[in-house]
Curated annotation (Swiss-Prot):
Record region (Disordered): 32-58, 73-166, 183-237, 265-296
Group of enzyme by EC: hydrolase
Cited PANTHER family: ATP-DEPENDENT RNA HELICASE DBP3
Keywords: ATP-binding, Helicase, Hydrolase, Nucleotide-binding, RNA-binding
GO biological process: alternative mRNA splicing, via spliceosome; regulation of gene expression
Keyword Cytoplasm applies: no
Name of the protein this chain belongs to: Putative ATP-dependent RNA helicase CG14443
Positions contributing to ATP binding: 374-381
Chain intervals with Low complexity compositional bias: 34-58, 125-160
UniProt keyword Repressor, yes or no: no
Organism: Drosophila melanogaster (Fruit fly)
Length: 736
């Protein structure tokens, strides 16, 4: 090859151009249409380029390029066009591709500067002999060879193709890389690709063929996300690349719908970079199963038994992950407890777990946080106690260097702590576990190392705040808050929050309550994290046993409540000499003392409240249970301590602040009294006017009789004009 030919391949024009070269170079200027796409084979051969021969004639070198198949020119002949840089020593073979040397490859990499885009010769193999004969003549005329399909000039497009073609970054891509053919999307592997491992080029990596977006994809695109602006459209559906027409919904047959499904383009994702998921016609391949069948939930025997059990006992589960919830324990043998605990359960005469126990035991063994919501007397104590004892028994040998209990149970009052401690001792003594009960007046024994601690919430939280007593909770991994709704009502929410911050980060929390109030929901979302709520009974906190209690709400004047109370007591004692036990609820301790002095003039009576010591209250409750007196006056604080059978009448002298407390008073007296003939009498005044609609709705749900005065107040609140408060003058700080 002559020096001029090598410079043409490299694309670096160092010699001065002659006038003939400038004239022949004009067809390559921007805006011209000198291209092989619009010319015949004879025109291509006539426009062949002739170069001056040099003294040192190089051997013929071919620069391999993609083989184009274009149907035009001589009839019945498919000319194969090749891009080559050749010497003019003689004819060459028309078939196959010749390999380029390492020198030509290294020189061709320097053509990426954009000065000359490598206008190479496209020659037909059928006219190679004619062109080789004219190679000996040293002509300075340059043929108007066609530019590449990837050229940036305006002449890069032929007559039928008017679209712009992408621009190649380097001459390496031009000589050794393949590009997309206008008639095909197949790539031809060149010798460059076959010997890719031998190449040590520092240029950009080879860009293999990747199917780009077609015109259909650009037209329809990926399904747009659903938003208020396109709510009525059908194109937001996931998996549909084209919108579904509403007219096709009913007027199309199954075969036509199947054809449309085959013709449509379904995708795995909205991302355009994901591969398409094609669906084939099932009629052509009947052995292949359908790919778009929906997943069916397994309906095995275990699942059916668990679902029927929950439906039969009205168990409602609420969790962050409903798929991994275990099935309820239907018998003691499947609970996973050791033989000692099973023997103790059999000795007490239990036949099987209660609904709240069956569902709580299976979830508590997995270490999840639980909220237990059920009425009084449903077995919540054993529901959280037995899993805690098993966890304490398994972790007893661990963390010997740390102090504090492994299981901590907090209750709302002293009497409840005594009851829980009695159950704890019955199951822990055979296992030789150390337990301790911290009551109201007892002192903290720092040297007493216990595995399980039962304490009243007020006393323990008071000792934590006191710097004289150091409460160690390093080993505590199981915390129970029994009757947390009562703790929140008393005002211990802030202290409970400080207690939870002192626990280990992975401690398991069990919360039990008789109601599901808004305060409890807020606290559970704040501290329990991904908890599971187990609810047994009606959603509106009304059990079947509460519906059997007769309820009567009387609208009275606040000044005449004492007279109305005496009339009710007189009517009760007139029916029988032994009418049954009566509990009167009030709000303040002062009112307790006043009513006790008034009623004591007629019949024996006593009162309990938080101002008295625990021994005094416990003695009064014991005498009330034995029958020393049948009337007792109590506050809301001590309502949980009245676990006495035989209570028949409950009088709400002061109506509670909300419906939840109203239900608690009934559940802790009427249901625990084991007396179905219990009656609840409530005095409703204008001070409770804001609760009138809730009270009426509650009575309607319980199917109770509603007085006309109460209905009138409810209608006035709902439909009457809104009453404004009287103007109260503001009090300013005056300087005297």
């Amino acid at each position: 090859m002559c020096e001029k030919a090598k410079k043409l391949v490299i694309g670096n024009w160092k010699d001065n151009e002659t006038d003939a070269e400038k004239v022949q170079k004009k067809p390559f200027l921007k805006g011209t249409k000198s291209s092989i796409w619009g010319s015949s084979a004879s025109d291509i051969s006539g426009q062949s380029r002739s170069l001056k021969s040099s003294s040192s004639v190089l051997s013929s070198k071919f620069v391999t390029k993609r083989l184009f198949t274009i149907q035009h020119g001589i009839e019945g002949q498919k000319p194969n066009f090749k891009i080559r840089s050749e010497s003019f020593s003689g004819p060459h073979s028309a078939g196959g591709f010749s390999k380029s040397t390492r020198e030509s490859r290294s020189k061709s990499r320097s053509m990426g500067n954009g000065k000359f885009r490598g206008k190479s010769h496209l020659r037909s193999s059928s006219e190679s002999a004619h062109s080789s004969g004219s190679e000996s003549s040293s002509s300075d005329s340059n043929s108007g060879s066609s530019s590449d399909s990837d050229s940036t000039t305006g002449s890069s497009s032929h007559g039928s193709d008017t679209g712009e073609r992408p621009r190649m970054r380097s001459a390496v891509f031009r000589i050794h890389e393949t590009w997309q053919s206008p008639n095909s999307f197949k790539a031809v592997k060149t010798s460059r690709e076959n010997k890719e491992s031998r190449s040590r080029s520092s240029s950009l990596p080879q860009k293999r063929f990747c199917p780009s977006k077609t015109q259909n994809d650009l037209t329809y695109g990926s399904p747009e996300p659903k938003s208020p602006s396109n709510r009525g459209r059908n194109s937001w559906r996931v998996g549909m690349r084209t919108p579904w027409k509403k007219s096709q919904s009913r007027s199309m047959s199954c075969s036509s719908i199947q054809k449309i499904l085959v013709s449509r383009s379904f995708t795995r994702s909205r991302s355009p970079h994901r591969n398409t998921l094609c669906y084939q016609d099932q009629s052509k391949n009947p052995s292949r199963p359908s790919n778009y069948n929906t997943w069916k939930q397994p309906m095995d025997e275990v699942y059916n038994n668990a679902a029927n059990y929950r439906k039969r006992h009205n168990i409602t589960l609420t969790s962050w992950n409903m798929r991994n919830l275990p099935e309820p324990v239907l018998s003691f043998e499947r609970s996973g407890f050791n033989a000692t605990i099973l023997q103790q359960l059999e000795d007490q005469g239990y036949d099987g777990p209660t609904p709240i126990q069956a569902q709580t035991w299976s979830i508590a063994k997995e270490g999840k946080n639980i909220v237990m919501i059920s009425g009084k007397g449903t077995g919540k104590t054993l529901g959280y106690l037995l899993p805690g004892i098993m966890k304490m028994h398994n972790q007893r040998g661990l963390m010997q260097h740390k102090k504090g209990p492994i299981v901590l149970i907090l209750v709302d009052c002293r009497e409840a702590a005594v009851m829980v401690q009695r159950e704890v001792l019955y199951y822990t003594n055979p296992l030789e576990l150390r337990t301790h009960c911290l009551l109201g007046n007892s002192q903290w024994q720092g040297h007493a190392e216990c595995d399980l601690l039962v304490a009243s919430a007020g006393r323990l939280l008071q000792m934590i705040d006191n710097k004289k007593h150091v409460v160690e909770l390093e080993r505590c991994t199981y915390l129970v808050l029994d009757n947390i709704d009562r703790m929140i009502d008393v005002g211990l929410e802030g202290n409970i929050c400080r207690l939870l911050c002192r626990l280990r980060p992975h401690a398991q929390l069990i919360v039990s309550s008789t109601s599901w109030s808004s305060n409890l929901k807020r606290m559970a979302n704040k501290f329990l994290g991904q908890y599971t709520a187990i609810r047994v009974g009606e959603i509106n906190n009304i059990g079947v046993r509460l519906q059997n209690i007769r309820q009567r709400v009387e609208v009275v004047n606040g000044l005449s409540k004492v007279e109305r109370l005496m009339k009710e007591l007189t009517a009760i004692y007139d029916t029988s000499d032994i009418p049954g036990k009566v509990v009167i609820y009030v709000k303040r301790q002062k009112v307790v003392e006043e009513l006790v002095d008034l009623i004591r003039n007629c019949v024996p009576c006593e009162g309990i409240h938080g101002g008295r010591t625990a021994q005094e209250n416990q003695g009064i409750i014991h005498d009330f249970g034995t029958g020393a007196y049948n009337i007792i006056v109590a506050t809301q604080m001590t309502s949980n301590c009245l676990d006495v059978p035989g209570i028949r009448y409950v009088i709400n002298y002061d109506f509670p602040d909300n419906i939840d407390k109203y239900v608690q008073r009934m559940s802790r007296t009427g249901c625990l009294s084991y007396n179905r003939n219990c009656e609840v009498i409530s005095f409703f005044t204008m001070a409770n006017y804001k609760l009138v609609t809730e009270v009426v709705d509650f009575l309607k749900i319980c199917k109770q009789e509603i007085g006309p005065h109460l209905l009138q107040l409810a209608e006035e609140k709902m439909f009457g004009p809104r009453q404004r408060r009287r103007h109260r003058p503001q009090r300013y700080n005056r300087m005297h």
